[in-house]
UniProtKB/Swiss-Prot annotation:
Organism of derivation: Pseudomonas syringae pv. tomato
Annotated signal sequence range: none
Record's protein name: Sensor protein CopS
Domain of life, per lineage: Bacteria
Keyword ATP-binding attached: yes
Membrane topology according to the record: Multi-pass membrane protein
A molecular function (GO) term: ATP binding
Keyword Nucleotide-binding: yes
Sequence intervals crossing the membrane: 10-30, 137-157, 160-180
InterPro entries membership: CusS-like_sensor, CztS_silS_copS, HAMP_dom, HATPase_C_sf, His_kinase_dom, HisK_dim/P_dom, HisK_dim/P_sf, TCS_sensor_his_kinase
GO cellular component, one term: plasma membrane
Amino acid sequence: MKPGSLTLRLSLLFVVAVAAVLIIVGVAFNELSRHHFRALDAQALGEKLEAITQIAKESGANPELLKARWHTLLGAHPDLSAVFLKTDGTPFFAEPPQSAVPSLAQATQRDGVWEWEKEGRMFRALTASVSLPTASPPLTAWLVLDVTTHMHFFAMLERWFWGVLLASTVLSAALGWLVAKNGLRPVARVTQTAASMSAGSLKERIPLEPVPDELRALITAFNSMLGRLDDSFMRLSNFSADIAHELRTPISNLRTHTEVILAKKRAPEVYEENLSSNLEELNRLSGIIDGMLFLAKSDNGLIVPEAVELDLRTVISKLFGYYEFLAEDKGIQLQASGNASIFADSVMIDRVVSNLLSNALRYTSSGETIKVSIHDHGGRVELRLENPGPEIVPQHLDRIFDRFYRVDPARREGRECGAGASDCPVLDASAWRHYLVYIPRGPNDLHPHLHAIACPTNLTCRPDSLGTAKPGHTRLGEHETGCHCAG
């Protein structure tokens, strides 16, 4: 068994707990027993002293009768001795006769009773003044009780106690190991289930029944982790498949065109036209690769933003000029309102707004209007892009930031690689981090609408600043957190 095993630790804790309880109980029992015996001895000595005093009163002035009656009283107790001293220190009476006054140099007094050990024996004594019926001064009486049997009893009790403690420790260690082993069986089952899981079985979950309450939180968290891993693994698999598909198309086009041209000799104009077509495909392929590299860098925090003061109205006007001809061809009007200044990375802002505008143009019907409004709230700037469009199906809401994700699972050709809304989280990696995305549930929703992915949808993207705004502009900086999606 490993020293660091949980079973061993629980067993040791069980042993320590049992040993501590037994020691506390043993020490308490020992002290209470000693106090009880001490009280019994003091009571016995007190009763004998009262009897001696009563005999002294009843014997009158006859010393011999007094001594005889004291002898009768004390002689029946072999473990009890008595010495009566006159005021000058000479003995008046002793029983047994050879009894001497005890030396109190090493004696201690507890509860009015003297206690000491001598030559391996233990004694307790009580002293008092005894008055005689005659006019003579009172005597000093010493009653000494031999309690060696008590000392032997407690010595035996201690031996038994330590023996029982040792046996109980060994037994509790064995029982503690069995109890811990049995109690940790659910953990072993969880471990076996976790060990049996692989990339192909991430959909399995550890059942919560029958599981102790202490492990429910752990298993719930573990199952949640499996869910996240399964989702991430599926997204990664789909991402890899989509990358292969997106890269295969331009490469296949290049190879096909080249094979056709090389099949026979052709005029220089044909070669020039083919090279131009190949260059177009290469540019598309380069754009896809650049986009993937950009997103990979953003995921790893390798993009360092260059914050400059930007006039949002100027940014919107510039992008409107870029998309003006496309909007005219589709019969869509572009409308901008409001103005505000912010500190942000111009490339990031252009990239995000351009992506949103292109998606809005793609899914806005002819004759409709795309509205971009800028609202300066003093401490934050709100950028809204509104366009009419169909409602997002709820099951797609959690996937709006997935790269290459499309509502229609069927693949389609086009110039877009599907990276779309994944540009919005890029702002998080670029330190412009508080971009809230609102998703309207229906056409009557009062939230503004915004297209943010390469599929028919409605979204609202609003960059908010948590920092302090300077006069005339709002700063988006390091203290801002999160790119959130909420319905």
